[in-house]
Design a protein with these regions (language model features):
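Juxtamembrane intracellular "pre-TM" segments in multi-pass secondary transporters
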Residues: 3-9, 193-226
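Conserved MFS/SLC helix-loop-helix module at the cytosolic interface between two early adjacent transmembrane helices
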Residues: 65-104
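Cytoplasmic helix-loop-helix junction between adjacent transmembrane helices
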Residues: 103, 109-148
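Extracytoplasmic gate region of multi-pass secondary transporters
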Residues: 34-35, 220-274, 362-363, 367
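Helix-to-loop junctions at the C-terminal end of transmembrane segments
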Residues: 66-78, 273-286
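Cytoplasmic membrane-interface "Motif A"-like loop-to-helix N-cap segments
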Residues: 76-87, 282-296
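Helix-loop-helix hairpin linking two adjacent transmembrane segments in secondary transporters
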Residues: 143-192
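Extracytoplasmic
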Residues: 15-49, 239-245, 362-367
Length: 405
């Protein structure tokens, strides 16, 4: 771990955290833009449903696989240097995507964006742990998460309006400029104080960090947790961030702005959901029953959305999913209750990595299902959503069947 830093004033700490939160806002925007970008990209670049799914998944794949590297960087180099070195890749990826003329270039842009955004939330949590009192960690982290959700508001109606009046290239261009402004703000505003004199310094090697993560799999309940983490968050972001827009446009002939309005409503419904579940859910290991129950409820909701082809019903189901989406944060409470303090940090890192690699897996597999569906006389969106529902049930079953913490 990095040595403890000298204390910051409350005003200075909040000012720096707000600047860092802007990178997190943009990471949320980039991970959810496929729902609105999907239809124009499909039309202009002749993308198949499978290619669209793979493109959206590329962000989450890059984001997920870079979590260990970013965690090590934070320990060795600190918050400021980690985000300043990584985030230019987001700017470059967005700029490259705005000029893409082929699927391959679009994929490279998406991989760069995902890599650059990888430390966006980690730097916030590490900064909070270093510069806020321990009792403030959860409420301040929750505030940052709520701020971050505004990124998905940007990629709802505002992005749809911009694309409808210009093109999808302008969407990437505006996000690239926003990322550049954010980088400059962080460069100007975020300056962590030097470590206190005499503070011990321990810097883990990459191999030691990987060994520590792999050691968690010797605990029998880790497998169930990872199986669940791979599918829970993935279902929400795959619908909100990938299939919602194309489904509404193709099934019901919604305009891009109309589908953006639905995405906006779904996002607004989800903003207060984590805080709600944090208040009503039981503490400790009782969370396990809640996690399994909510996964089953959401899987049934997704299956209903797949089979009921009525516009108002699909819109209502999407908003209901937003209201229920906060159940996923209960995984963090489960980790806190199940793992000893000595390995809790690594367990949380593993959970985060599994969540984002799961999004990549979910989007790729649902894209494959959508691509194969017409050959069997099945609507692509029906196949994609039923596949997602089945994967969520499988993850919940593994979580129930394997030993608990």
């Amino acid at each position: 771990m990095s040595p403890p830093a000298a204390p910051l004033s409350t005003r200075a700490a909040w000012g720096m955290l707000l600047a860092l939160s802007c990178a997190f806002i943009l990471s949320q925007a980039f991970r959810s833009l496929a729902a609105i970008m999907g239809p124009p990209l499909t039309q202009d670049l002749q993308l198949s449903a499978q290619e669209l799914g793979n493109w959206s998944a590329a962000y989450h794949f890059a984001f997920g696989v870079m979590q260990v590297a970013m965690g090590i960087s934070l320990d060795v180099w600190g918050v400021r240097r980690t985000i300043l070195l990584a985030f230019p890749l987001t700017i470059a990826g967005a700029a490259l995507s705005s000029q893409a003329g082929s699927y391959g270039v679009l994929m490279w842009g998406q991989l760069l964006i995902g890599t650059g955004c990888a430390p966006a939330f980690l730097v916030c949590t590490v900064f909070i742990s270093r510069h806020f009192a321990p009792a403030r960690f959860t409420p301040v982290s929750g505030t940052v998460m709520s701020i971050g959700y505004s990124g998905m508001l940007l990629t709802a109606t505002p992005l749809a309006w911009l694309i409808a009046r210009t093109s999808w290239r302008w969407g990437f261009g505006v996000l690239a400029v926003a990322a550049l402004v954010t980088w400059l703000w962080i460069f100007w505003r975020v300056h962590e104080p030097a470590p206190e004199p005499g503070a011990p310094t321990r810097r883990p090697s990459p191999m030691a960090a990987l060994t520590g993560l792999m050691a968690l799999f010797r605990l029998p309940y880790t497998r169930g947790l990872v199986a669940y983490a791979l599918v829970a968050y993935a279902t929400y972001i795959t619908i909100r961030g990938l299939w919602l827009g194309p489904l509404l446009v193709d099934r019901f002939d919604f305009s891009l702005v109309q589908s953006g309005n639905v995405a906006l409503a779904m996002t607004l419904a989800s903003i207060g959901s984590p805080a709600l579940f944090g208040r009503i859910a039981p503490a400790g290991r009782g969370l396990r029953r809640w996690l399994i129950l909510m996964a089953v409820v959401v899987a049934l909701l997704i299956a209903t959305m797949a089979l009921v082809r009525v516009a108002w019903a699909d819109v209502l189901l999407a908003v209901c999913f937003g209201l229920l989406s906060g159940y996923m944060v209960l995984q963090y409470g489960y980790v806190h209750a199940s793992y000893p303090a000595a390995v809790r940090g690594r367990a949380l890192s593993l959970l985060t990595m599994a969540m984002f690699l799961g999004v990549s897996l979910m989007q790729s597999v649902s894209g494959i299902a959508a691509g194969l569906a017409p050959g069997f006389g099945v609507e692509p969106f029906t196949a994609a959503l039923l596949t997602m529902s089945a994967l969520l049930l499988a993850g919940a079953f593994a979580f129930w069947k394997w030993p608990q913490g």
